[in-house]
A protein has these predicted regions:
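Short Cys/His-rich local motifs and their 1-3 flanking residues in nucleic-acid-associated proteins
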Residues: 49, 70, 106-109
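Short Cys/His-centered divalent metal-binding micro-motifs
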Residues: 91-114
Length: 114
């Protein structure tokens, strides 16, 4: 998808200007597995609340792919839009499970814990 992006006085038509890449196969499941505690449960890192989900089911409304504090999407997207990352580098970064943690949607989308 290529959309125009107004940045100062120039227009960019880069992929992912106004949308995010899709996750590659296995990324979501790996993030989930990486987040399991010693008891096998996944908890929201902000509140400690247990997140109940079964891989293969929709995670819509159950949990979000929250970025870890060191991997803030807006900063990487800005670097990509400014030409500091190629499209491949941006998409590869986006699909690195190490950049994510499961978060409850309300906590992730509110940016309350950033």
């Amino acid at each position: 998808m290529c959309l125009a992006y107004q940045s100062g006085s120039k227009t960019n038509t880069k992929p992912y200007t106004n949308s995010r890449p899709s996750f590659r196969k296995g990324v979501v499941e790996q993030v989930w597995e990486n987040a399991k505690g010693p008891d096998g449960l996944v908890r929201d890192p902000n509140t400690g609340e247990v997140i109940n989900w079964t891989p293969g089911e929709s995670r819509k409304g159950v949990w979000d792919m929250g970025h870890i504090p060191e991997a803030k999407y807006s900063k990487r997207h800005e670097a990509y839009m400014n030409g500091k990352l190629t499209t491949k580098e941006f998409v590869d970064w986006y699909n690195d499970p190490a950049n994510y943690r499961p978060e409850l949607p309300s906590n992730n989308r509110s940016h309350k814990y950033e």
